[in-house]
Regions:
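Long, structured stretches of catalytic cores involved in phosphate-ester chemistry, encompassing
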Residues: 1, 27-347
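Bacterial Sec-dependent N-terminal signal peptides
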Residues: 1-27
């Protein structure tokens, strides 16, 4: 009985202390984390299918939207047909409404480029480039109208910080891959040193962008995956010397906090690699597909993967918090449901 009374008195004391907590301390604990900049991105969007994700994407109030490639599926040498497919996507009511509120950037992958797994050999690439730029409403006097390839960079200044978006073109200059006839995989790595992913001109441009970057974060958009390289589909790992070249450039350039965004795979995942000599880890955030996905995905090896693969229709969100120097990355789906999330701290 005495034990019960002692316990009851102790309970009341604890409850009393809880009730009289300093409200100022509570406000500090419950202080809402602010987001200074929001990137939404995605890839693999078939213009003939339903586009269910735009309302959910809009709920995240993105500062910008980035197409990671395969904006439409239009493998063709018929430019009139390609133009029709782009217009079909533009006519989608939800997408049209979205673009009136959010700035849109993007690069292409093979299916909007015009040739499945295509590269430098595609004979209609110059014409296809103009249609791609038309879709993005790029001005007729923009430098991209005269250059070879759709690569592009833009700085965003917010709250005394700069975020640089670097859009790579992994199609226009990419040389031949090596078919794998020994396994069930589509491709195997080229002999070391054989081939180029970006071409000499684009490599020099990228070097200049990184060396001269004053950005707190450098967002590099590659239509194909950079870190995941064991699956046998298109990936930077098919040209291992090009992987080394980009990693070495990130180290030598002094560019801060590079994050890679990729698509192509019809799955979404987040990969992370620590690189000797680099002050921060490389993250490759893959977001794919917006209208269709690899729903029968059974698994594949990726030694850099964080969390789980998402094989449902999805999009990617990056929330930048300059106060805490963090970037929170989310894989989301219909109704804004969160499938995976990861927060990286930066200096």
């Amino acid at each position: 009985m005495n034990y019960f009374k002692s316990f009851f008195i102790l309970f009341l004391l604890i409850l009393s202390c809880k009730t009289n907590e300093n409200p100022k301390n509570n406000s500090l604990v419950l202080e809402k984390t602010t987001t200074d900049f929001v990137i939404a991105f995605g890839s693999c969007n078939n213009q003939t299918l339903a586009n269910p994700l735009w309302p959910a994407i809009e709920k995240n109030k993105p500062t910008i939207w980035i197409w990671g490639g395969d904006i439409v599926y239009t493998d063709t040498y018929d430019m009139a047909y390609m133009a029709e497919n782009y217009q079909k996507q533009k006519n989608n009511a939800d997408y049209a409404a979205f673009t009136k509120k959010v700035e849109v950037l993007g690069t292409w992958d093979d299916h909007d480029y015009g040739l499945n797994d295509g590269g430098v050999e595609y004979s209609k690439k110059a014409e296809a480039q103009q249609l791609f730029l038309d879709f993005l409403n790029v001005a007729k006097n923009d430098a991209r109208r005269k250059q070879e390839g759709v690569y592009f960079a833009k700085d965003y200044s917010v709250n005394n910080k700069i975020i640089k978006i670097i859009l790579l073109d992994t199609r226009y200059f990419r040389t031949a891959l090596t078919a794998d006839h020994e396994t069930e995989k589509r491709f195997k790595p080229n002999p070391y040193g054989e081939g180029t992913m970006l071409g000499e001109t684009q490599w020099e441009w990228l070097k200049s962008e990184l060396q001269n970057s004053k950005a707190a974060y450098n967002i590099i958009v590659s239509s194909i995956q950079f870190l995941s390289g064991e699956h046998g589909f298109e990936t930077w790992a098919n040209m291992p010397h090009e992987v080394d070249k980009l990693e070495n450039l990130l180290k030598s350039s002094g560019a801060k906090n590079a994050i890679i965004l990729s698509g192509d795979r019809h799955i979404s995942e987040i990969s992370k690699k620590e690189i000797d000599g680099l002050m921060y880890p490389i993250i490759d955030f893959t977001s794919s597909g917006l209208t269709h996905s690899y729903s029968d995905f059974k698994g594949e090896s990726n030694k850099y993967r964080l969390g789980n693969v998402v094989s449902k229709k999805s999009f990617g969100i990056l929330n930048f918090n300059f106060k805490t120097n963090t970037v929170t990355m989310e894989i989301k789906g219909e109704n804004n449901v969160v499938f995976e999330t990861y927060t990286q701290n930066y200096q």
